[in-house]
A protein has these predicted regions:
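Beta-sheet ligand-binding and adhesion/scaffold domains
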Residues: 44-48, 71, 97-160
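N-terminal helix-cap/turn-to-beta initiation motif at the start of protein domains
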Residues: 26-43, 67-68, 158-159
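N-terminal leader/targeting helix
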Residues: 38-60
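Short, aromatic- and cysteine-enriched interfacial helices/patches
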Residues: 29, 37, 85-87, 116-117, ...
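Bacterial N-terminal signal peptides that target proteins for export
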Residues: 1-10
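N-terminal glycine/threonine-rich, aromatic-flanked beta-hairpin/loop signature
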Residues: 53-99
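Bacterial signal peptide processing site
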Residues: 21-24
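Bacterial N-terminal signal peptides
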Residues: 9-17
Length: 160
């Protein structure tokens, strides 16, 4: 009788241990990475200053999409500017440091098709909080044209 009591529990243990062998995983194998606080739409103002010109301000929207495999620290960003001198829509890249949580330093850079018929470059560095981004904004529009460099600021609030 003693042998039978040992064999039955051992058989059940072996059956349970091998039940999943040879099968593909059907669910998540690790924790979900979640969403970044930056994901979504941010709206606000873009102020641009150019040599010999007064500062001017226009509306701007940035939409952040997290790049997979970057610990929620790198993003594709679509910028839609309604600024009179820089009416552009472009997709650039952003990164945040030192972690993926606010407050964070944010750096954004990329190229855009200038309304003046060339390729411009932009750079923005600043601070990202849970609901606001405040950063400088600079670049070179058409380097062959006068007053092609610009500086300024972008101030954004999370809207979606």
């Amino acid at each position: 009788m003693r042998v039978r009591r040992t064999v039955v529990p051992l058989s059940l243990l072996l059956l349970a241990a091998t039940a999943g062998c040879g099968k593909e995983a059907t669910g998540p194998t690790g924790p979900s990475p979640g969403r970044s606080f930056l994901e979504g739409t941010w709206s606000g103002t873009l102020t641009i200053e150019r040599p010999g010109e007064p500062a001017s301000t226009g509306q701007v929207t940035w939409t952040f999409q997290t790049v997979d495999g970057t610990n929620l620290q790198s993003f594709r960003v679509t910028i839609r500017s309604q600024h009179a001198w820089l009416p552009i829509t472009t997709t650039v890249t952003s990164a945040i440091t030192p972690s993926n949580q606010p407050p964070a330093r944010i750096s954004t850079q990329g190229d855009y098709a200038s309304p003046r018929g060339c390729t411009g470059t932009l750079l923005s560095v600043g601070n990202a909080e849970t609901q606001t981004i405040n950063a400088d904004f600079s670049g070179v529009d058409c380097s062959s044209l006068p007053n092609s460099t610009f500086t300024g600021r972008v101030t954004l609030t999370k809207t979606g």
